[in-house]
Structures are given as C-alpha cells and as structure tokens.
C-alpha cells in the first residue's frame, strides 16, 4: 500500500495516505488523555493510528486496542505496528457500534470522531466517513466508550465546541 511516513518526536513512524492522515487535533487529544505507562487504552475511530502511536511514542506500553471501520486506514496502522515491532497496539478492523472485545476493562478511551452530522460531503468515500457521521454518531462513540471502560475509566473526545452548548430547559 502506498503511504507517506510521519515521524514522531521519539522516532515512532506513522503511516498516512492521501485519504487517511491526521491533524493537530489528534495529537492534542492523545496528549490530553495520555494513559499511564501500563494502563489499558482504546483508540476509537483510530484512522491511521495516530493517537495509539503517539501514546506509544511517549512511553505507553499497556494493551491498546485501535478500532477502525475503514480497511485502508486499519491496514496502515497494522503495517506500522508490524514493521516497528509494536506488540501492545492491536489494530481492530471493526465497527465500534458492535465492538465488544475487552468490555469493561479499559482505563482510557479516546476518540477523534467524525465532526459533521450534515452538510456537503467529500466525493471520496474514505474522507466522507472520517469527517461526517455516515457510519457512526457521537452517541455511538459514547455508547462504545461506556461499554469498554471500567469503573472510574476516562473517555476523551475531540469535537466541535458548538456541540458542547445545550440550551437551558424552560
């Protein structure tokens, strides 16, 4: 598979494609909710695996499940972890709406979900899936996090600020 390589601070390589790449929001999310060295972690809507790989680059060595719906994106992460011998990150080609592996066992779940519920979509299917709620909604992400997290676990999302406002009840 044709890809470009981005190198993180401590030399971990992230494989990207024209459709599956990452932005600063994913790096900020990874740093915001960074798991402790041996904690169990899940990277939902993992794309090319930037959150999981950033955690690894910064010292996380606990089990990490990276759940991604799109085969090309999941394959990029699979290739990156295989070629670099990163055994604690397990890419899962799966729909988070039905993902159940490790239920109730995770300390940290992170997700940089699709941001847009409506509006014009890219003609490229992969880009549309990554940016628009075509295959999962914010509610789906929260439900998956709830299933996977242990008591006291943390779910961290990077989302549009306008969705944080809820009008007061009358």
Outline where the language-model segments fall.
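Conserved SAM/SAH cofactor-binding pocket of Class I
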Residues: 31-103, 108-111, 117-122
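Mobile active-site "lid"/loop adjacent to the S-adenosyl-L-methionine
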Residues: 113-140
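A short glycine-rich, Lys/Arg-flanked "PGG" loop and its adjoining helix->strand segment in the class I
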Residues: 138-151
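Class I SAM-dependent transferase core
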Residues: 1-36
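Short "lid" loop at the C-terminus of a central beta-strand within the Rossmann-like core
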Residues: 115-116, 160-164
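Conserved small/polar residues in nucleotide/adenosyl-binding loops
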Residues: 165-170
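Conserved beta-strand signature within the Rossmann-like core of class I S-adenosyl-L-methionine
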Residues: 153-158
């Amino acid at each position: 598979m044709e890809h470009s390589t981005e190198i993180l601070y401590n030399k971990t390589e992230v494989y990207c494609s024209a459709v599956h790449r990452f932005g600063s929001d994913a790096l900020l999310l990874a740093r915001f909710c960074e798991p402790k060295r041996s904690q169990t972690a899940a990277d939902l809507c993992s794309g090319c695996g930037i959150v999981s790989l950033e955690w690894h680059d910064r010292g996380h060595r606990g089990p990490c499940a990276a759940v991604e719906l799109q085969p090309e994106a999941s394959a990029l992460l699979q290739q990156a972890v295989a070629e670099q011998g990163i055994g604690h990150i397990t890419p899962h080609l799966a729909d988070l709406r039905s993902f159940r592996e490790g239920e109730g066992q995770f300390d940290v779940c992170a997700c940089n979900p699709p941001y847009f519920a409506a509006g014009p979509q890219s003609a490229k299917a992969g880009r549309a899936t990554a940016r628009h709620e075509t295959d999962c909604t914010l509610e789906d992400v929260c439900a998956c996090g709830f299933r996977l997290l242990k008591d006291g676990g943390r779910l961290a999302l990077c989302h549009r600020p306008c969705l944080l406002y809820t009008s007061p009840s009358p």
